[in-house]
Amino acid sequence: MNTLRSMSISRRLWLILVVAVAMLVVLGLLMLRQIHGDLYQAKAEKTRHVVQTAAGVLAYYQGLEAAGTLSREAAQQQALQVVRALRYDHDDYFWINDLGPKMIMHPANPKLDDQDLSAIRDPDGFAVFNEMVALARQQDAGPVNYRWPKPGASEPVAKTSYIQLFKPWGWIIGSGVYVDDVQAEFARQLRDASLVGVGIALLMALVVMLIARSIARPLQEAVQAMGNIASGESDLTRRLDTHGSDEITHLGEHFNRFNGKLQGVVGQLQGAAHALAQSAGHVGDNAGAAQQRSAQQSLQMDQVATAVNEVTYAVQDVAKTAEQAAGEMRTAQQQVTHGQQAIHGSLAQIDRLSLTIDEAVQVIRDLAGHSTRIGGVLDVIRSIAEQTNLLALNAAIEAARAGEQGRGFAVVADEVRLLAQRTAQSTAEIHTMIEHLQSQSDAAVKAIDTSSEASRQTVEQAREAGASLDAINQVLNNLTALNASIASATLQQSHVVEEINRNVLDTAGLSQQTADAARQSSDAGVALGRLSEELEQLLRQFRV
């Protein structure tokens, strides 16, 4: 099967012709062999029949002898005359010999009459008449094949004879035919059969050629069309001939339908590939723009993170400053306490003013010195309040920049700024009071020498100074509480800002990831564009 599949269909069809011709030749040879045998058999049968007929002549005359009509000699002579005259097929004759063997009568060669035949042999050394006698003795009748020259010729040719023993007279009657005419007849029939066989072979060759052409040519066209598609020519507009109703026509119809469907599919794929290329271009452009926007967003988030870090540092500075202010306030409170103690001491000294003016003057001078120092402390407090106000303003600005997450911090910053403003106002009032105290102390120093009334007024002023110091002490206590609140709020704000900073850093990381994803999308868009171009190039191979 695989060997046949390695041959083309046309060759296989011609192989059928070769096998058919070979079988025809074999059949012809067998038939010729049969004909050859039949010709020989026909000759032999014909000879047997004519010999049996001639033997009937002998039986007739022997019957006359038996009836007493003729003597044996007369009956034999008449029988010999009749048999001598018998002919068939123009020149064929009968002879008679006895069991001697001795020739009784030979019409074609009278010289053999009364001759001893035992020494006669054919060119092959075959003792013809001895074999005839032996056959007659054994079977009474039968064929004998040998070679014998034709009448008037010296060259022996093949001959077949049939002999029959006529027992009443002891004669053997026989007749033979030359088989060279059988060979001629066989050659004629061989020639006729060969001509018929050649004619049949030529007719079969013509039929096979027409059939092979009707099969191979459409198949070659189909194979060529398939090969063109497979090799890259890809002409999808090609159609095969579909005239007919055989399997090859059905194959062509199926191929045409397949090519038509493939043509439609490839056409749709070309349109889809073109649309895909355009979409890939749009995707690449959008991805590139998204990448740029993501990069800008990442840069802005880095800037926001930097600003938040600065705010964190500023808040930490505010916390430190608030802590320092609290320390300064504690120092001021201690100083106010000392001032109160000094005022009380001054009151005691004023009560003893009548005892010693010098001690009162000294006390007043001490009071003036303390007032001066308190003024310095108040300057520091005023400076701290101004810085706190400035820091609160900056914190409010940064909180406003932080948006919704910094709204609470903005409220706290506004409260701190208001507290700082009130602290500054109170400090200014205290400073004014200190200045007034100093002026009164100076007036008391000047007036202490002139009038006890002045001393009383000084005592009164000292009491007022004590009350003022109490008020200052209360204010300082309030400032200390406010500073503690500011420090606590600043600490909380620091935690909030740190949380904002972490969120901003996380957002910056997400922005970077978004930028990376946008870059990957851009790369994917470029790769998709290349793939769509390759697909378009592949589809351009098909002509639709």
Curated annotation (Swiss-Prot):
Annotated ranges, domain Methyl-accepting transducer: 272-508
Domain HAMP: 213-267
Membrane topology, from the record: Multi-pass membrane protein
Entry function: Chemotactic-signal transducers respond to changes in the concentration of attractants and repellents in the environment, transduce a signal from the outside to the inside of the cell, and facilitate sensory adaptation through the variation of the level of methylation. McpP is a chemoreceptor that responds specifically to some C2 and C3 carboxylic acids. Recognizes acetate, pyruvate, propionate, and L-lactate.
Parts of the chain that traverse the membrane: 12-32, 50-70, 192-212
Disruption phenotype: Deletion of the gene does not alter motility but largely reduces chemotaxis to acetate, pyruvate, propionate, and L-lactate.
Stored Pfam families: HAMP, MCPsignal, sCache_2
Protein name stated in the entry: Methyl-accepting chemotaxis protein McpP
PROSITE patterns: CHEMOTAXIS_TRANSDUC_2, HAMP
Compartments where located: Cell membrane
Species this chain originates from: Pseudomonas putida (strain ATCC 47054 / DSM 6125 / CFBP 8728 / NCIMB 11950 / KT2440)
